[in-house]
């Protein structure tokens, strides 16, 4: 360990009450690069010292000598040292900057790479040629002083114009035109997490393995599906006009030239604003530079991103195996690498798309309700909170089926409370949600009112569970990863699964959510000639728009909204149209034929009154406006009644055959059977009475 250096750093830290002074030997630098986090603290420095001693002692014992241990440490250092642009190790740097192997570098080129290490963002040869040349000459002079090179070699290297044959600028241009797409970045993040969890690697080790380890990665991406999804997200015609504003994010790194310490002489800033033109964005950048830059604070790197304010994200999965086939984390062109992915990183409220998961799935799965079961739609209050239906109406006895396709809030909340918060919460955990907590054991969860929110990816996976007959697969971006020798490093091909719902429950939910598409709130998500089931969601003040749906082949979820969480103006079901467009194209491209959702054993049908959902009375088939007896699914082991008894909504009324009012003493009369809601309105009465029918009004009596 560099004892003198550590003592110098400690003295400086005590004097300044900070821990920014670095004093690392190669061993400690390797540990910093490979194992330890970047936090600057005394505890981390102590860890470095302890691990450095332990590592050197272990290597001396294993390799037989201190000299062999030092050579091994040097090799590790040269293979892991950061050399700007995300490069790790001298081989990667040689390839990037000069297009050759490290062993093929000239002395001048090698010295320029060696010089990068002090402050990579300043001394990289493609960043600042003047500073890079100065550093290169420092390295060459030190080598000459140590008699590692001759004067002639020094003179030749000093005269060589290494900048004339840099290849990195062309490489950078190619890379900027071929940024990692949304899928590749999501796959890298999952692989990194799995390396840390399953191989006990640190974050630094996992990153080095991915980018410098020569891995062969097999992803689950379907290229044509990814292209289709990205194309839709880039098509401005698919989106509402909005307010014409654009979000600006300006990232800037500033070098303090008066601070010689390489570990703390840079500051990084993220500045944001909203503009209506590129000129405004450029003016904003100029103002930030004027604020941050001066004679002693120089620009290292900066990056400007201008994006449409109204954003969207989409995920497409194969529900049969959990494979993610396509993912898009934002609208328009992807602004760069390692950018915010709204499909995996944004936690948003999901609105009514949470109703089937938090309320109806547990209720049906535990045998409390069936599609034809009746719940009274009426004003209710829970703990001071009174949920209201989106249309402001209450219609009395209503079936679960109608509650889903008409997206009725009161029915969902009543169902959630019937199930119990603890049970509902456990089902959500089983559906794979990782960002919910005990605070979500609340009635608001039935309507998607979560403490933190959930990601589009996890919500899509939950719907894929229903589409897959109730069996959950964790979303998977890769199938297998091989190391540089061809050995299996990570294997996702046989993923563990667990059952969340009975097959019968999954089918009943699917059958009810088909009605969302055929006659409910999701008609704009229909796919011509293909069965679709799904659920729409809208949060308060139209801040978030969501839809999660599936065919017998694929499950897809879409979110639309502003990062700033403001109201979406004139949305006009744009998210549903995008979903339908993307999924229609995918099924067409693959030549997929329509087929039914697979119906499991254990289901039968039961006759019910189509108005009340109860067991039909003798009057039900005589409804004046057409409500009659229908049937709906129940499980064969269902013990309860779908409506708690025989229909009480249908009653016979004597009316005036001329006015449609209740008959007076002298009126010509006729008897009609009507289903009457709890508020006295007639259920099923059309706004425009058909020809040949009376406009019946039972709230008035004919004179």
Where are these regions (language model features)?
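Active-site-proximal helix/loop microenvironment
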Residues: 162, 169-176, 433-489, 494, ...
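Active-site-proximal alpha-helical segments within enzyme catalytic domains
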Residues: 1, 74-78, 109-118, 135-139, ...
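Conserved catalytic neighborhood of penicillin-recognizing serine enzymes
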Residues: 13-37, 170-178, 368-424, 484-515
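Extracytoplasmic/periplasmic proteins that interact with beta-lactams or build/remodel peptidoglycan
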Residues: 21, 25-29, 41-45, 101, ...
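Active-site beta-strand/loop architecture of penicillin-binding DD-peptidases
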Residues: 188-199, 205, 310-349, 361, ...
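Short pre-catalytic segments that frame enzyme active sites
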Residues: 92-96, 121-125, 154, 160, ...
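Peptidoglycan glycan-strand catalytic modules in the bacterial/periplasmic cell-wall system
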Residues: 1-151, 155, 204-206, 331-333, ...
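Soluble, non-transmembrane domains of envelope/secretory-pathway proteins that act on or interact
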Residues: 256-263, 532-533, 537-703
């Amino acid at each position: 360990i560099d004892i003198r250096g550590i003592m110098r750093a400690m003295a400086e830290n005590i004097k300044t009450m900070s821990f920014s002074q670095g004093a690392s030997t190669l061993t400690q630098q390797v540990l910093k690069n490979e194992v330890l986090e970047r936090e600057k603290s005394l505890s981390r420095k102590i860890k470095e010292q302890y691990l450095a001693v332990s590592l050197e002692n272990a290597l001396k014992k294993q390799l037989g000598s201190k000299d062999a241990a030092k050579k091994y440490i040097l090799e590790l250092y040269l293979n892991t040292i950061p050399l700007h642009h995300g490069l790790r190790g001298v081989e990667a740097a040689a390839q990037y900057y000069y297009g050759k192997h490290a062993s093929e570098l000239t002395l001048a080129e090698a010295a320029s790479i060696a010089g990068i290490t002090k402050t990579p963002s300043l001394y990289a040869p493609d960043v600042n040629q003047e500073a890079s040349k100065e550093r290169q000459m420092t390295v060459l002079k030190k080598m000459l002083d140590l008699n590692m090179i001759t004067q002639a070699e020094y003179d030749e290297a000093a005269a060589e114009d290494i900048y004339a044959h840099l290849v990195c600028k062309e490489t950078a241009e190619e890379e900027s035109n071929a940024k990692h797409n949304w899928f590749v970045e999501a796959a890298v993040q999952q692989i990194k997490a799995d390396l840390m969890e399953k191989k006990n690697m640190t974050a630094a080790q996992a990153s080095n393995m991915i980018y410098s380890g020569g891995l062969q990665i097999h992803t689950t991406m379907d290229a044509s599906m990814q292209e289709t999804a990205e194309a839709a997200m880039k098509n401005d015609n698919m989106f509402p006009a909005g307010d014409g504003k654009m979000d600006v994010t300006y990232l800037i790194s500033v070098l303090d030239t008066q601070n010689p310490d390489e570990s703390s002489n840079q500051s990084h800033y993220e500045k944001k604003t909203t503009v209506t033109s590129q000129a405004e964005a450029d003016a904003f950048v100029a103002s930030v530079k004027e604020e941050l830059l001066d004679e002693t604070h120089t620009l290292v790197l900066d990056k400007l991103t201008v994006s449409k304010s109204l954003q969207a994200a989409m995920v497409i999965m194969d529900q049969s195996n959990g494979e993610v086939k396509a993912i898009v984390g934002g609208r328009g062109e992807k602004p760069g690498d390692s950018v915010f992915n709204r499909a995996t990183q944004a936690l948003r409220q999901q609105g009514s798309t949470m109703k089937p998961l938090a309320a109806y799935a547990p209720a049906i799965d535990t045998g409390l309700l069936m599609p034809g079961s009746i719940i009274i739609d009426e004003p209710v209050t829970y703990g001071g909170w009174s949920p209201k239906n989106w249309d402001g109406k209450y219609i009395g006895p209503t079936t679960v089926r109608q509650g889903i396709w008409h997206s009725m809030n009161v029915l969902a909340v009543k169902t959630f409370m019937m199930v119990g918060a603890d049970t509902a919460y456990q089902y959500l955990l089983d559906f794979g949600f990782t960002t919910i907590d005990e605070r979500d054991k609340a009635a608001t969860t039935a309507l998607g009112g979560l403490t933190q929110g959930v990601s589009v990816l996890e919500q899509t996976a939950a719907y894929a569970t229903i589409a897959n007959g109730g069996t959950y697969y964790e979303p998977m971006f890769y199938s297998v990863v091989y190391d540089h020798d061809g050995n299996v490093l990570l294997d996702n091909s046989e993923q563990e699964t667990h059952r969340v719902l009975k097959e019968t429950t999954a089918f009943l939910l699917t059958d009810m959510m088909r009605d969302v598409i055929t006659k409910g709130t999701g008609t704009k998500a229909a796919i011509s000639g293909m069965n679709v089931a799904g659920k729409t969601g809208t949060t308060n003040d139209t801040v978030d728009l969501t839809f999660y749906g599936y065919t017998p082949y694929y499950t897809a979820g879409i979110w639309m909204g502003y990062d700033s969480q403001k109201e979406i103006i004139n949305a006009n079901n744009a998210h549903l149209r995008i979903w339908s467009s993307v999924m229609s194209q995918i099924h067409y491209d693959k030549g997929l034929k329509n087929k039914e959702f697979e119906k499991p054993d254990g289901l039968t049908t039961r006759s019910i009154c189509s108005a009340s959902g109860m067991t039909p009375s003798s009057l039900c088939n005589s409804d004046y406006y057409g409500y009659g007896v229908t049937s709906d699914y129940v499980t064969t082991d269902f013990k309860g009644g779908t409506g708690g008894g025989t229909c009480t909504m249908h009653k016979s009324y004597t009316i005036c055959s001329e006015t449609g009012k209740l008959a007076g003493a002298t009126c010509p009369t006729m008897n009609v059977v009507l289903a009457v809601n709890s508020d006295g309105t007639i259920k099923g009465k059309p706004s425009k009475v058909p020809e040949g029918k009376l406009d019946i009004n039972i709230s008035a009596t004919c004179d």
